[in-house]
């Protein structure tokens, strides 16, 4: 069984926002906090781009679902209105 703190952290990460994890460099070894070479910058930019594209896709999908639900609600309201007349 997981401790409460671990369970709470796992539940927080399961929300709709993707957590961003960056690689430390080409060799996988930890680097100093101040060293940023071109590979790390390029990799971070690529990962950021991928995350933004994924979030755009999710947002588009949610908007489509919302539009379908709005149409369904409008249809049901029209049906109710026609029955009450």
UniProtKB/Swiss-Prot annotation:
Chain coiled-coil ranges: 41-84
Recorded superkingdom: Eukaryota
Membrane-spanning residues: none
Keywords: Coiled coil, Mitochondrion, Transit peptide
Protein localization: Mitochondrion
GO cellular component entries: mitochondrion
Effect recorded for residue 41 to Q/E: No loss of inhibitory activity
Transit peptide (first-last residue): 1-22
InterPro entries: ATPase_inhibitor_mt
GO terms of molecular function: ATPase inhibitor activity; enzyme inhibitor activity; molecular function inhibitor activity
Domain notes: The inhibitory N-terminal region (residues 23-59) is entrapped between the C-terminal domains of the alpha(ADP-bound)-beta(ADP-bound) (ATP1-ATP2) subunits in one of the 3 catalytic interfaces of F(1)F(0)-ATPase.
Family in the record: Belongs to the ATPase inhibitor family.
Subunit and partners: Monomer and homodimer. The protein aggregates less strongly with increasing pH.
Other known facts: Present with 981 molecules/cell in log phase SD medium.
Role this protein plays: Endogenous ATPase inhibitor, which inhibits specifically the reverse ATPase reaction of mitochondrial F(1)F(0)-type ATP synthase. It limits ATP depletion when the mitochondrial membrane potential falls below a threshold and the F(1)F(0)-ATP synthase starts hydrolyzing ATP to pump protons out of the mitochondrial matrix. Required to avoid the consumption of cellular ATP when the F(1)F(0)-ATP synthase enzyme acts as an ATP hydrolase.
The protein's name: F(1)-ATPase inhibitor IF(1), mitochondrial
Lineage: Eukaryota, Fungi, Dikarya, Ascomycota, Saccharomycotina
